[in-house]
A protein has these predicted regions:
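Short, Lys/Arg-enriched N-terminal segments with co-localized hydrophobic residues
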Residues: 1-7
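Acetyl-CoA-dependent GNAT
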Residues: 10, 14-84, 88-90, 160
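Solvent-exposed beta-strand sheet faces enriched in polar/charged residues
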Residues: 74, 84, 118-120, 140
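A conserved beta-turn-beta hairpin within the catalytic core of GNAT-like acetyltransferases
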Residues: 75-83, 92, 111-115, 149-151
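Active-site acidic-Proline motif in GNAT/NAT acetyltransferases
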Residues: 88-90, 94, 123-124
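Conserved acetyl-CoA pyrophosphate-binding loop and the N-cap/start of the following alpha-helix
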Residues: 91, 95-104
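C-terminal "cap" of GNAT-fold acetyltransferases
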Residues: 114-118, 122-129, 135, 142-161
Length: 161
């Protein structure tokens, strides 16, 4: 019998326009997580759909040719990469986040060799914060930001590579 452990194979590829549109218009999250719908903020939507703006910083993550989610990687200081990420709505909340996040961190390390990785998360998103803490992101500070036509509190977190 075949007892080999399944190794999750994630592939990172630069996001195409078609993929950006698929994510922007068809990914809808439930309840308070609808905050993360691209269409919830016109400005974010326009930025996300603009290939020049996305540049080569946005990657789609696939597994067996299925889109699992996406990551953005932005160099914010000489040795610091700030990441953004999103998972396909029907995969959220089922314990897939940790593997997905780990894959993104590994990809960032191998591609950019940062000393530090940062991210910002809405403070109401306790579910995500728990996952970030699990792989040793630490809390840096909270800040207020205008988005989706309102002001929200965000938590900045940091990971030492």
């Amino acid at each position: 019998s075949d007892t080999r452990r399944m190794i999750v194979e994630y592939k990172f590829e630069i996001m195409t326009q078609e993929q950006a549109e698929e994510i922007a218009f068809n990914w809808h999250y439930d309840n308070e997580y609808s905050f993360y719908d691209m269409e919830a903020d016109q400005e974010d939507l326009v930025d996300f759909l603009d290939p020049k703006n996305r540049g080569d910083a946005n990657f789609v993550v696939t597994k067996d040719n299925d889109i699992i989610g996406y990551f953005s990687f932005n160099k914010v200081a000489i040795n610091t990469i700030d990441i953004g990420l999103g998972m396909r709505p029907n995969l959220v909340g089922n314990g897939n986040g940790l593997e997905f996040l780990k894959a993104g961190i590994e990809f960032a390390k191998s591609k950019y060799s940062p000393q530090k990785i940062t991210l910002s998360v809405a403070t109401f998103n306790k579910r995500a914060i728990k996952v970030y803490r699990k792989i040793w992101f630490i809390e840096v500070e909270t800040f207020m930001q205008d988005t989706n036509g309102d002001r929200f509190e965000f938590l900045k977190m940091s990971y030492q590579c």
